[in-house]
């Protein structure tokens, strides 16, 4: 992979890992380098092995909460408020003009409309969804020209594939049209995130379904980020003349853009590193040849990595100068400041263990974050009222 920060950055990241082995909620979680971040643990009195004595000053700056610019750490947001309870594996959130949101439920195949006051209305049960394993009704996106075209888009697992379907929505769904079919499906790694970029085109993430080879096969739709028009055609400027925008992905679960148009994506690693990647046209992100930072020509290294216990990063949003990544296995919301060049500052872990598995995160028109839990997906420990949507007011 192409190492954006160089060997010195890698050594710094390794030093941080050795010197700092715990991270309480809201505490800084690592450097601005691509190597692994310090392990995060909320256990009181957790200590580090401190096998690299030369890192004392680096560890001290992390503990003091210094930002890349030398200032103070961003304040921790206030505790979330619960907007909605009683959902079943809410997978994606996309906002309509006016502030209501469309929310997908993976298992039930229900498309819901949720108001800012917490009212829930069933729009429809999406036809043709085959929910099993990690498949089901996954992503949803609203056209940036919704006022004119009333288009909404869903990504779901069908009987033989994953597919992207467009509807017209004006209080009810109509004019169903399959835009993309034949996306590989499996019990795992179905991708499924949909989002419109600032260029007005629809992006979709796909997984490699556990079949590693398809991630490097540019002719396969699996293990990719796709870019298309609202009619499902390859968008102008795509690097290979197909739907494929980037390849070498294992299972991208979140996509977001910052104020300057930089694109970021969260990705599940296997057993070692989860990632946030800076997404660039035509790049190869390495899977299965590389997991995490490889420094190998031809592969693009991640912007940040975590241990899989800290993250399993899913939904991703950008607000107030930071990326906000929902973590499933890590049971926390990560805040990652990014600068105008797409470089990342030190991540902070928020609400660790307080709400269980977090999957969806989206920015509402009023600037708040809506965060969906995923405690009823068979891998969590449901609490009374789960699953729920939380509202977070992000700090600057």
Feature annotation, model-predicted:
Residues 1-14:
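N-terminal export and membrane-targeting signals
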Residues 6-8, 24-48, 61-211, 262-269, ...:
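Acidic, Gly/Ser/Thr-rich repeat motifs that build Ca2+-stabilized beta-propeller blades
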Residues 19-22:
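C-terminal motif of bacterial Sec signal peptides marking the signal peptidase cleavage site
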Residues 121-135, 176-190, 228-247, 283-308, ...:
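Surface-exposed loop and turn segments in beta-propeller and other repeat-based domains
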Residues 166-173, 226-235, 279-287, 291, ...:
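Short loop/turn segments immediately following beta-strands, especially the blade-tip
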Residues 216-260:
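Loop-centered beta-sheet repeat module
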Residues 359:
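Segments of small-molecule ligand-sensing domains
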């Amino acid at each position: 992979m192409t190492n954006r920060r160089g060997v010195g950055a890698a050594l710094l990241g390794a030093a941080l890992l050795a010197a700092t082995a715990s991270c309480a909620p809201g505490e800084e979680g690592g450097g601005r380098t691509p190597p692994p971040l310090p392990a995060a643990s909320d256990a009181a009195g957790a200590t580090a092995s401190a096998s690299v004595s030369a890192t004392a000053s680096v560890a001290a700056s992390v503990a003091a909460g210094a930002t890349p610019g030398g200032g103070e750490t961003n304040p921790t947001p206030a505790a979330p408020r619960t907007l909605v309870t009683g959902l079943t594996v809410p997978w994606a959130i996309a906002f309509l003009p006016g502030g209501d949101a469309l929310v997908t439920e993976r298992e039930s195949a229900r498309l819901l409309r949720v108001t800012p006051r917490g009212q829930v209305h069933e729009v429809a049960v999406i036809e043709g969804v085959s929910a099993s394993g990690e498949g089901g009704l996954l992503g949803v996106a609203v056209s940036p020209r919704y006022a004119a075209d009333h288009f909404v888009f869903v990504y779901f697992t069908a009987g033989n594939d994953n597919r992207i379907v467009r509807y017209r929505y004006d209080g009810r769904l109509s004019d169903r049209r399959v835009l993309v079919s034949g996306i590989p499906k499996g019990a795992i790694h179905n991708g499924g995130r949909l989002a419109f970029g600032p260029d007005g085109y629809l992006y979709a993430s796909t997984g490699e379904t556990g079949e590693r080879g398809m991630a490097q096969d540019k002719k396969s739709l699996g293990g990719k980020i796709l870019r298309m028009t609202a009619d499902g055609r390859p968008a102008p400027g795509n690097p290979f003349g197909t739907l494929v925008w980037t390849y070498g992905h294992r299972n991208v679960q979140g996509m977001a853009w910052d104020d300057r148009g930089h694109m970021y994506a969260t990705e599940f690693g296997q057993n070692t590193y989860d990632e946030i990647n800076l997404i660039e046209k035509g790049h190869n992100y390495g899977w299965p040849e590389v997991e995490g930072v490889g420094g190998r020509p031809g592969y693009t290294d991640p912007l940040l990595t975590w241990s899989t216990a800290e993250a399993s990063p899913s939904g991703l949003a950008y607000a107030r100068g930071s990326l906000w990544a929902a973590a499933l296995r890590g049971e926390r919301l990560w805040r990652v400041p990014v600068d105008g060049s797409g470089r990342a500052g030190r991540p902070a872990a928020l609400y660790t263990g307080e709400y269980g598995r977090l999957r969806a995160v989206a920015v509402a028109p009023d600037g708040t974050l809506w965060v969906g839990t995923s405690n009823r997906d068979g891998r969590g420990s449901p609490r009374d009222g789960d699953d729920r949507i939380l509202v977070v007011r992000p700090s600057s």
